[in-house]
């Protein structure tokens, strides 16, 4: 698929995709994913063509931007590594997020409280989000999916080939997708200027690591306060000694 020069993959974005291991696919290749294979490593891991990934990502962004009401786009991730990315994508683009378990019947059973009638569905993994894809097929809702080389492509209308198992890869794809959607909508006018939002915001963070980091910061602050108190105490002691010496000199 040939793209206008404006949509060409920049060296900076290519470096981001490679740094996040977006190009590392599975050992097995599904028949519909064969056009996206660039090469195979000696250890059996297939390498995904990053150019194909970018082309499909731009195509998906153009589809999303064509929907007038952003809330009619539903972003889904049952996979833990993609839940933070889905929430950030929805916050920046106005889409409706479903992070966590997808309630069966959300697209087909209008009696349920979680019933929705979207015009487009985006999923992180066709396997973990199989229920959402299946229900979308029942009511003729187009589906965009982040697919690995061994992912099933049944009922998927637009497949973005990438590593959908790594937390950095998933977060980066959602980040780039959100950025391209905002550019197409005109929210980001200048394509030559970088987006003020960093990709790290879309990456999954382990709650235990966050708690440990907060605890370390608190410990560092306490240590700094203790050092400051010790310095103040030493200064007070020096001032007291100096005052006593001056008093002795005056008496003499």
Swiss-Prot record:
Present with 93700 molecules/cell in log phase SD medium. One of its GO terms (cellular component) is cytoplasmic stress granule. The modification N-acetylserine is found at residue 2. PANTHER family: 40S RIBOSOMAL PROTEIN SA (PTHR11489). Belongs to the universal ribosomal protein uS2 family. Residues 209-252 are annotated as: Disordered. NCBIfam families: uS2_euk_arch. One of its GO terms (molecular function) is structural constituent of ribosome. N-terminally acetylated by acetyltransferase NatA. It comes from Saccharomyces cerevisiae (strain ATCC 204508 / S288c) (Baker's yeast). The keyword Cell membrane does not apply. Keywords: Acetylation, Cytoplasm, Ribonucleoprotein, Ribosomal protein, Ribosome biogenesis, rRNA processing. Disruption phenotype: Reduction in growth rate, a decrease in free 40S subunits, an increase in the amount of free 60S subunits and a decrease in polysome size. This is Small ribosomal subunit protein uS2A. It holds the Pfam family Ribosomal_S2. Component of the ribosome, a large ribonucleoprotein complex responsible for the synthesis of proteins in the cell. The small ribosomal subunit (SSU) binds messenger RNAs (mRNAs) and translates the encoded message by selecting cognate aminoacyl-transfer RNA (tRNA) molecules. The large subunit (LSU) contains the ribosomal catalytic site termed the peptidyl transferase center (PTC), which catalyzes the formation of peptide bonds, thereby polymerizing the amino acids delivered by tRNAs into a polypeptide chain. InterPro entries: Ribosomal_uS2, Ribosomal_uS2_CS, Ribosomal_uS2_euk, Ribosomal_uS2_euk/arc, Ribosomal_uS2_flav_dom_sf. Component of the small ribosomal subunit (SSU). Mature yeast ribosomes consist of a small (40S) and a large (60S) subunit. The 40S small subunit contains 1 molecule of ribosomal RNA (18S rRNA) and 33 different proteins (encoded by 57 genes). The large 60S subunit contains 3 rRNA molecules (25S, 5.8S and 5S rRNA) and 46 different proteins (encoded by 81 genes). It comes from the Eukaryota. Residues 218-252 have a biased composition (Acidic residues). One of its GO terms (biological process) is ribosomal small subunit assembly. It is found in: Cytoplasm.
């Amino acid at each position: 698929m040939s793209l206008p020069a404006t949509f060409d993959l920049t060296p900076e974005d290519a470096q981001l995709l490679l740094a996040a291991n977006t190009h590392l696919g599975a050992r097995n290749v599904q028949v519909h994913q064969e056009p996206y294979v660039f090469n195979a490593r000696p250890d059996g891991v297939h390498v995904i063509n990053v150019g194909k990934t970018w082309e499909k990502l731009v195509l998906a962004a153009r589809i999303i931007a064509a929907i007038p009401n952003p809330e009619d786009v539903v972003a889904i991730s049952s996979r833990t590594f993609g839940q933070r990315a889905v929430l950030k994508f929805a916050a920046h683009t106005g889409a409706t997020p479903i992070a966590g378990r997808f309630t069966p019947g959300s697209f087909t059973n209008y009696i349920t409280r979680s019933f929705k009638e979207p015009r487009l569905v985006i999923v992180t993994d066709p396997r973990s989000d199989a229920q959402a894809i299946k229900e979308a097929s029942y009511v003729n809702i187009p589906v965009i999916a982040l697919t690995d080389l061994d992912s099933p492509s049944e009922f998927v209308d637009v497949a973005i080939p990438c590593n959908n198992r790594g937390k950095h890869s998933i977060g980066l794809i959602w980040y780039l997708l959100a950025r391209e959607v905002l550019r197409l909508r005109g929210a980001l006018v200048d394509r030559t200027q970088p987006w003020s939002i960093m990709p790290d915001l879309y990456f999954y963070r382990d709650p235990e690591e966050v708690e440990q980091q907060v605890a370390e910061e608190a410990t560092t602050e306490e240590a700094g306060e203790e050092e400051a108190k010790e310095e103040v105490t030493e200064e007070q002691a020096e001032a007291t000694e100096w005052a006593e010496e001056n008093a002795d000199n005056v008496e003499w």
